[in-house]
Swiss-Prot record:
GO terms for cellular component: cytosolic large ribosomal subunit. This is Large ribosomal subunit protein eL31. GO terms for molecular function: structural constituent of ribosome. It comes from the Archaea. GO terms for biological process: cytoplasmic translation. The gene is rpl31e. Belongs to the eukaryotic ribosomal protein eL31 family. It comes from Methanocella arvoryzae (strain DSM 22066 / NBRC 105507 / MRE50). Keywords: Ribonucleoprotein, Ribosomal protein. InterPro entries: Ribosomal_eL31, Ribosomal_eL31_dom_sf.
């Protein structure tokens, strides 16, 4: 029987509170790294294979480099190429 290539989807609420411990000029950059680390751990995949959508990137950077959100809801879709992370509600 042939196996189907299913893309698995999972919704996560990723806490970004630890980013507040970093200098203000590094916070949004660190928030993106925290998202990659979180998805890598929970989806069991290397960080290099995680793609961050432009909508998710804009949501993190919406208030600039100094004030990223304290949490973000992410829809992670696993495919053969890796994992794509999107903001929940963005299509």
């Amino acid at each position: 029987m042939a196996e189907e290539n299913k893309a698995t989807e999972q919704i996560y609420t990723i806490p970004l509170r630890e980013v507040k411990d970093y200098p203000v000029w590094k916070r949004s950059n660190k928030a993106i790294k925290v998202i990659r680390e979180y998805l890598s751990k929970h989806m069991k995949i290397e960080e290099e294979k995680i793609k961050i959508s432009s909508e998710l990137n804009e949501a993190v950077w919406e208030h600039g480099i100094e004030k990223p959100p304290s949490a973000v809801r992410v829809k992670a879709v696993r495919s053969e190429e890796g994992v794509t992370a999107q903001v929940v509600g963005a299509e």
